């Protein structure tokens, strides 16, 4: 039997848009800003530059180890939530989606996206209930194609 002890917990953090901090050269982090939008940043890749930045920071001079910083838009967060949620066997909890984003999923994606997704449902690649959207085992084999609808 497959148990929860076989679950990759750090991936679940990424796929749930939960905060995480990365330490060390090339490490990436994700935090939630005051406005609720996602903030991403990563450290320099050079070990020497990373260590030097910490030495300088401790001496109160010089730049930080952060090399790049980006702030998500609302649609970035929505798209990432859907894209990563569909990677999980449990799929997307539509109640959590509404709480997080203040609207139903299909208010963000109507028209051709919804129509194309319904074709995947009709073909047995995805399943939809009142509470959940998920990919079936058959759908996992073409998951990137399905997830691309929401990016």
How would you label these PLM feature ranges?
Residues 108-116:
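Short, well-ordered alpha-helical segments
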Residues 118-131:
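A short, conserved structural fragment
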Residues 1-106:
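C-terminal scaffold of the Radical SAM
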Residues 138-151:
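Short, amphipathic alpha-helical interaction segments positioned at domain boundaries
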Residues 7-11, 119, 141:
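Short secondary-structure transition/capping segments
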Residues 76, 111, 137-140:
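An alpha-helix initiation/capping motif
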Residues 132-136:
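Minor-groove-contacting beta-hairpin "wing" of winged helix-turn-helix DNA-binding domains
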């Amino acid at each position: 039997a497959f148990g929860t002890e076989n679950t990759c917990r750090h991936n679940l953090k990424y796929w749930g848009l939960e905060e995480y901090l990365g330490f060390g050269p090339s490490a990436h982090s994700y935090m939630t800003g005051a406005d609720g939008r996602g903030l991403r940043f990563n450290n320099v890749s050079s070990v020497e530059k990373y260590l030097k930045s910490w030495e300088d920071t401790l001496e109160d001079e010089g730049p930080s180890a952060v090399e790049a910083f980006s702030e998500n838009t609302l649609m970035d967060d929505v798209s990432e939530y859907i894209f990563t949620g569909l990677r999980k066997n449990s799929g997307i909890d539509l109640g959590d989606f509404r709480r997080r984003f203040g609207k139903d999923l299909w208010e963000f994606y109507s028209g051709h996206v919804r129509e194309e997704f319904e074709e995947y449902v009709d073909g047995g690649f995805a399943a939809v209930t009142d509470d959940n959207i998920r990919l079936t085992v058959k759908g996992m084999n073409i998951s990137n194609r399905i997830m691309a609808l929401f990016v």
